[in-house]
Amino acid sequence: MEDEKIIELYFERKESAITETALKYGNYLYKIAYNILLNNEDSEESVNDTYLGAWNAVPPEKPRIFSAFLSKITRYISLNKWRSKKTEKRGSGEVDLAFEEIEECVPSNNSVFEEIETKELAKMISDFLKKLPETERVIFIRRYYYFDSVSDICKKFGFSKSKTSTLLCRTRKKILSFLEKEGVLDERR
């Protein structure tokens, strides 16, 4: 079913909206949640919470890009669940690793999470990413937004682990340099 029709079902408050959303986007949303949580049960719960979040948000919200709207809800719910579990016990995984890698670009003594949620910084980084070549931008987003593992990215793009890691490292350095030039970070050199 087309996204416009699914959104129409939400506006009509028909429960089939959730069924259609699950049929079309369930696997996609589960992958996002699982990349963050690394747990089947928690991932399924995040996806179900996403459906509830969409139900509560539409209407009045009318998403332009439904998949992006849903992925944002799933990511937010999954990261909150991950944070609460992390405070309960120290864990490791792609989310921890991705945050460690990107932490050098975040400008403050505050936690990475607080800084990433800062709208102004997010907009600056988003604008910067739009200027990158498509492959570089997509790889960066797959790693640091969707938390794909480096090996998954290698498979998807047909690159070696070394090439992918180097590309990510160079992109992080470009962002760091950009943020320094914009005055967001003190120059570290």
Predicted regions and their residues:
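Short, leucine-enriched amphipathic alpha-helices that occur as contiguous helical runs
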Residues: 3, 26, 71, 118, ...
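Sigma70-family region 2
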Residues: 11-12, 48-66, 85-86
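Short, charged helix-capping/linker segments at alpha-helix termini
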Residues: 11-20, 30-49, 161, 184-187
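Amphipathic alpha-helical segment used for protein-protein interaction
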Residues: 12-15, 107-141, 148, 155, ...
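Residue-level preference for hydrophobic side chains embedded in well-ordered alpha helices
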Residues: 21, 25, 29, 50, ...
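Short helix-capping/turn signature of helix-turn-helix
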Residues: 24-26, 36, 141-148
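DNA-recognition helix of helix-turn-helix
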Residues: 65, 79, 125-126, 136, ...
